[in-house]
């Protein structure tokens, strides 16, 4: 159950710490990021920023030059379903097209993230939540003052994955392209166990956040 009233951080820290949040699928990462946002943080979601770029005419133009006119609809918007068909296959050609897509979106997304972080710091916001897929592998560790890694016990995690329809083979393919979670935990500032209720997780997040803000 959600708590009746969200608790807020009323006093900004002297600086604006950047907290990277990572975790395997169904580990509670979005719940943590959303709760941190409710406590006064600026949530920067790289996936959402990247998706928003697909409405940019310059990006659509670059994608057309790579993948052809078929990805553009009659109203000049991008056909995301056609683009997905091109880049999310299992063959090497699809993988190559995905790398091309990432080569267009990732630099733009990084630039926007850097701009939003600078804005948050200039406005002396209490803290920033940096939510980036493959945050450690993508070179964002030095951007963060802290990295929080969500951890779920194996049995509970399997239940959560099954309940949300995750495909085991797809999960294994994803895992093969990134650091092991043991390595990620070692590279993180804090490992947060999500093995209780959602309310317990929120309380734990609040405690960890208080520790971060008090140290700044």
From Swiss-Prot:
InterPro entries: Depp_CoAkinase, P-loop_NTPase. Pfam families: CoaE. The keyword Cytoplasm applies. The keyword Cytoplasm applies. GO terms for molecular function: ATP binding; dephospho-CoA kinase activity. It catalyses: 3'-dephospho-CoA + ATP = ADP + CoA + H(+). It is found in: Cytoplasm. It comes from the Bacteria. Residues 18-216 form the DPCK domain. GO terms for biological process: coenzyme A biosynthetic process. Its EC number is 2.7.1.24. SUPFAM superfamilies: P-loop containing nucleoside triphosphate hydrolases. Belongs to the CoaE family. Catalyzes the phosphorylation of the 3'-hydroxyl group of dephosphocoenzyme A to form coenzyme A. This is Dephospho-CoA kinase.
């Amino acid at each position: 159950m959600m708590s009746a009233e969200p608790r807020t951080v009323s006093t900004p820290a002297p600086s604006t710490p950047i907290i990277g949040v990572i975790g395997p699928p169904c580990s509670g990462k979005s719940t943590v990021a959303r709760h941190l946002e409710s406590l006064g943080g600026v949530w920067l979601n790289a996936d959402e920023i990247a998706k928003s770029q697909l409405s940019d005419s310059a990006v659509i133009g670059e994608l057309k030059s790579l993948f052809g006119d078929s990805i553009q609809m009659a109203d000049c918007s991008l056909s995301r379903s056609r683009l997905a068909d091109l880049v999310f296959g299992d063959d090497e050609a699809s993988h190559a097209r995905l790398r091309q897509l990432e080569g267009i979106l990732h630099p733009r997304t990084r630039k926007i993230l850097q701009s939003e972080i600078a804005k948050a710091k200039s406005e002396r916001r209490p803290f920033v939540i940096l939510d980036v897929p493959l945050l450690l592998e993508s070179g964002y560790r030095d951007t963060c003052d802290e990295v929080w890694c969500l951890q779920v016990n194996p049995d509970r995690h399997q239940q959560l994955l099954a309940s949300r329809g995750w495909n085991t083979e797809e999960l294994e393919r994803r895992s093969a392209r990134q650091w092991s979670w043991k390595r990620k935990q070692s590279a993180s500032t804090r490992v947060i166990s999500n093995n209780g209720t959602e309310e317990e997780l929120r309380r734990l997040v609040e405690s960890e956040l208080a520790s971060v803000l008090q140290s700044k």
